Amino acid sequence: MKIARVFPRRTKATPDDPLAFTGPPPKGGLPDIEEVHVSVAFTYDMEKACQLTEQWMKLGVPVHMGGPAFNMPGGDFVPGMYLKKGYVITSRGCPNRCWFCSVPRREGGRLRELPITEGNIVLDDNLLACSRQHIKAVFEMLGRQKERPIFTG
């Protein structure tokens, strides 16, 4: 399925493939798409995301809004879908319940280990809370990368 992904703003992590957009539908035409996902990372981008959703709905294809700003549990990680290639998420959640952190509430207070995909920029909520086996596998994957690892959390 061809899915256009729309982001309210461009960041270093925004995908840069032909189906990733940071504004209204382009006037010069659009590849055949079957669905549009408006991905919202920050709550302060909600108003712009709603405007973009209305603009993209005019194409007549299903448009869905989602992302971290909605405070819903994260799903499986698909490389390149909502984050530029090179960024990886190998686990979601955290078993700690720090008063200042929304991760345990968002992810249900548990840690989920995900399949490990190739990349060098690790965005896990709490990688060190994972099993030793998972951490070792992540470090082995990082050892295969041409770029040095970056842990941004």
Which role fits each region the language model picked out?
Residues 1-62, 71:
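A short, structured N-terminal alpha-helical element that caps or precedes a catalytic domain
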Residues 41-43, 68, 91-93:
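Beta-hairpin (beta-strand-turn-beta-strand) motif
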Residues 5, 37-41, 102-153:
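Core AdoMet radical
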Residues 1, 31-35, 60, 83-85, ...:
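A general structural motif
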Residues 65-85:
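Short, charged low-complexity linear segments at domain edges
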Residues 49-70, 137-153:
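P-loop/Walker A phosphate-binding loop and immediately adjacent motor/lid segment at beta-alpha junctions
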